[in-house]
Design a protein with these regions (language model features):
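Secreted/extracellular ectodomain signature
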Residues: 1-132
C-alpha cells in the first residue's frame, strides 16, 4: 500500500501524509514498483499549536523520513520493512503505519519528505501490504 504527502506546514515543520486514493484493502501499487519507504520514529512530540487531530487527520508524535526507492518485493514482512528503515536512519525507525492513535487514513508528523512520488507504508488490519 502506498501513501502520499499532501501538505507541509513550514511554520511548524510538519508534513501531512495521507492515503490519497490508496487501496487499503488489497494494495494499490504493483510490488515490483520501486518507491521510497515512509519511515517513522516516535519521540513523544506534543501536538503543535494550531493542529487539532481527529480520526481522519491524526498526530503521530515523532518524525518521518523517506528511504531511497526499493522494490515492494523486498518488503517480505513487517520486520523486513522495519529493517530497511533502521538501515537507512538508525535504531527506533520503522515503516510508517496506516493507523494512528485516534484512527487512520491520514496523519501529521514532523518532517519534510518529498511530495514528488508515492511511498510504501503498511496496514495491520487488511491485506494491503506486499507481504500479504
Amino acid at each position: 500500500m502506498t501513501w502520499a504527502k499532501v501538505a507541509h506546514n513550514a511554520g511548524n515543520g510538519t508534513d501531512h501524509v495521507d492515503c490519497d486514493s490508496c487501496n487499503a484493502y488489497t494494495g494499490d501499487t504493483a510490488c515490483t514498483t520501486a518507491l521510497p519507504v515512509l519511515c517513522y520514529k516516535s519521540d513523544g512530540s506534543p501536538v503543535p499549536a494550531g493542529l487539532t487531530p481527529d480520526f481522519y487527520n491524526g498526530w503521530q508524535p515523532g518524525h518521518i523520513s523517506l528511504t531511497l526507492p526499493v522494490q515492494g518485493t523486498l518488503l517480505t514482512s513487517l520486520a523486513a520493512a522495519n529493517q530497511i528503515c533502521v538501515n537507512s536512519f538508525g535504531t527506533g525507525y520503522g515503516i510508517a503505519s496506516f493507523s494512528h492513535s485516534l484512527g487512520g487514513w491520514s496523519w501529521w508528523s514532523y518532517g519534510d519528505v518529498s511530495s514528488s512520488q508515492r511511498f510504501w507504508t503498511y496496514i495491520s488490519s487488511t491485506s494491503g501490504n506486499c507481504w500479504n
